[in-house]
Regions:
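Phosphopantetheine-dependent thiolation modules in NRPS/PKS and related acyl-activating systems
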Residues: 2-38, 42-45, 52-53, 57-82
Length: 82
């Protein structure tokens, strides 16, 4: 998947748990959980939906590395190319 496809997958996964969120509302350099008002359970459901659509797992140890949309997209691109 290219970066645009990954971004669309991320937005769709966010909308699974927060359907009111529009992709253009997300500041790519701000904390994703705060931008989308995701509590810890919402965040886990979001990551599960993302794994289902991309086949890329983000282990708990890496949660701190993917706290913004840009960081998450970078992470997914690296993981997808391995």
């Amino acid at each position: 998947m290219n970066r645009d496809e990954l971004q669309q997958a991320v937005i769709e996964a966010i909308q699974v748990v927060a359907p009111e969120i529009e992709g253009d509302e997300i500041d790519a350099d701000e904390a994703l959980r705060e931008e989308c008002d995701l509590d810890s359970m919402d965040y886990l459901h979001f990551l599960a939906a993302l794994k289902q659509s991309t086949a890329i797992n983000v282990p708990e140890a890496d949660y701190g590395r993917v706290d913004t949309l840009n960081k998450l997209l970078d992470y997914l691109q690296r993981a997808g190319s391995q």
